[in-house]
Amino acid sequence: MHFLIPAAGSGSRMKAGKNKLLIDLEGESLIYWTLKSVFSASSTNWVGIIGQPKDKNLLLNSAKDFAHKVHWINGGDTRQQSVFNGLKALPKDAEKVLIHDGARCLINPELIDLCAKQLDENEAVILATKVTDTIKIVDNEGFIKETPDRNHLWAAQTPQGFLVDRLIKAHKMAIDKNWTVTDDASLFEILNWKVKIVEGAYSNIKITSPIDLKIAKLFVKDP
């Protein structure tokens, strides 16, 4: 399985003053823990990190202790552009790809393998968890408009997996039509292409705040 890791997080909400994937977590960088999980998945055979040139040496240094090679891909101005750069850098024989946020450093390798397996039967899959909170939809003035049935609500995670040719086609259409999305599955939604939900884990959090980092430390100490 080919694996792409967008890794251009600024760390502004972490007040880190650097790429948040370089923040220390129990003696190693966040990207180290992400790579450890990725390489622990039996389905992984090719990994590319997509990031900004200024972070290249530090990010790749976090990968030096792994037996597998990590390929570097220069990112774009947005996550969407960065992923498209990553897709263009895949080997020509790549048929399937998993895309995973570098800041989700607690991903279980078994979930990675599960997503890879689901791509045998689906052209697009994403990890997600059932929403347990009551969600409110509000108007522009902050007043509640409605409460959707949470039985139909899932919180999207990564990895998200796709057939490479289909995802490249979706990205090219997004460029032509000037679509902007926050994840790749959204492109498939716009095109009315099916995306299969694979139930993930609540521990697969995205590190975006100091609170998240404290939670991650607990999981790393006691997995």
From Swiss-Prot:
Pathway: Isoprenoid biosynthesis; isopentenyl diphosphate biosynthesis via DXP pathway; isopentenyl diphosphate from 1-deoxy-D-xylulose 5-phosphate: step 2/6. GO terms for biological process: isopentenyl diphosphate biosynthetic process, methylerythritol 4-phosphate pathway. The keyword Nucleotidyltransferase applies. One of its GO terms (molecular function) is 2-C-methyl-D-erythritol 4-phosphate cytidylyltransferase activity. The keyword Nucleotidyltransferase applies. It catalyses: 2-C-methyl-D-erythritol 4-phosphate + CTP + H(+) = 4-CDP-2-C-methyl-D-erythritol + diphosphate. Its EC number is 2.7.7.60. Keywords: Isoprene biosynthesis, Nucleotidyltransferase, Transferase. PROSITE patterns: ISPD (PS01295). The record marks R150, K206 as: Positions MEP for the nucleophilic attack. Signal peptide: none annotated. The record marks R13, K20 as: Transition state stabilizer. Catalyzes the formation of 4-diphosphocytidyl-2-C-methyl-D-erythritol from CTP and 2-C-methyl-D-erythritol 4-phosphate (MEP). PANTHER family: 2-C-METHYL-D-ERYTHRITOL 4-PHOSPHATE CYTIDYLYLTRANSFERASE, CHLOROPLASTIC (PTHR32125:SF4). Belongs to the IspD/TarI cytidylyltransferase family. IspD subfamily. This is 2-C-methyl-D-erythritol 4-phosphate cytidylyltransferase. It comes from Prochlorococcus marinus (strain MIT 9215). The lineage of its organism: Bacteria, Bacillati, Cyanobacteriota, Cyanophyceae, Synechococcales. The gene is ispD.
